[in-house]
Amino acid sequence: DVDSMQLISIMKNMRDAGVLASGDPLTQPAPFFIGAAWTPFAPPEEFRVLRLAKKIEAGADFIQTQAVFDMKRFATAVAAAQEMGLTEKAAILAGIIVPKSARMLEYMHANVPGVEVPDALIKRLAAAKDQRQEGYQITVELIQAARKIPGVKGVHLQAIESEEVLPEIIKSAGLLPRPQV
């Protein structure tokens, strides 16, 4: 068995040195762009940034976070990563899930490890006449807030079983036109 840091290291060696974990050479290096996950709010929180550092040191080029609904807490976590120089070594993408209902947020808060949903956000969605539409607006606000956090390079947007809403959310969040790279 290998853990996530070991797997990242194996992939980095396949890409950079052109060798498998066994030491056997590849016919050509693997063209990997290596990603990893970060759950900034999983207990014990104080160790999350250290685990992130290990993944980046192992070779992760980009990081996708677990769903983030509390941008103030997320900004604090990213600041800790930035103080360690991690945001200069790997792109941090904030995980943003489009909430469809207050019940969905309550479920995620109670049952998905590392997902923290502020009570005010749940109450706001519960009070809305059209929870789906309010969920779209919340998503736009979360994207805009994430983009203002120093060290965050983008978002990983997830609309579970409602992907058709993504173009309008992306447009409303000001993500268009896409930058030329």
Locate the predicted segments by residue.
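Conserved, mostly hydrophobic/aromatic
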Residues: 55, 59, 94, 155
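Active-site pocket-lining/capping segments in soluble small-molecule metabolic enzymes
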Residues: 2-27, 37-42, 84-144, 173-181
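Active-site glycine-rich loop that binds ribose-phosphate moieties when present
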Residues: 20-21, 44-58
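Glycine- and Gly-Pro-enriched alpha-helical subdomains that act as flexible
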Residues: 76-79, 94
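C-terminal/domain-terminus segments
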Residues: 149, 156-181
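Short, well-ordered secondary-structure micro-motifs
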Residues: 46-47, 75-76, 103-112, 167-168
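Structural motif
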Residues: 58, 149-150
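Catalytic beta/alpha-barrel core
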Residues: 61-70, 154-159
